[in-house]
């Protein structure tokens, strides 16, 4: 007689596991986070992690990057993502970035930027997520600069696309500097000098 074996119901919520894994990767990075760390952070056994996320640690990491892009990035961008964003929203984004970098929690930086530094060069899928984030940020900044130019808030000769690339690079540099030297005067000077080029 054939006995149908029903799969055991999951004893955890994958979304909750993903959130905890994202926080652990964000705090420690990919290489420094072991399966044991993930088990401790999520409370889920290794076999269950591999069952829910085929590919194990790396699959969970890639899902964590996507989760970060979906949940955390919109909070960081805030009004900068609005089609009407202009110079005030650009400055507000940088002010928020500096505030974050000066806080104990903010010292861990951005999961996507950390990934770019740590292992994007050797992981095409991770690099694709990082590139998507940078392109999103660049589009937001280009729109804001375009609006700022039409409103006379920056020089008429400013190229929105080129200016956006400069500001995106400044953001990434700020995050790296902020991790090593969280000095408010230094961080604000970096941001102010980038905007001075556009004034």
Residue map of PLM features:
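Short, solvent-exposed amphipathic helices
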Residues: 78, 125-136, 140-143
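Helix-turn-helix
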Residues: 5, 16, 20-63
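Amphipathic alpha-helical segments used for helix-helix packing
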Residues: 89-90, 104-125
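Short, basic, alpha-helical segments at the C-terminal edge of helix-turn-helix-like DNA-binding modules
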Residues: 66-71
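Hydrophobic alpha-helical connector segments
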Residues: 76-108, 160-167
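C-terminal peripheral helix-coil segments that are non-catalytic and often amphipathic
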Residues: 1-5, 95-99, 135-151, 161, ...
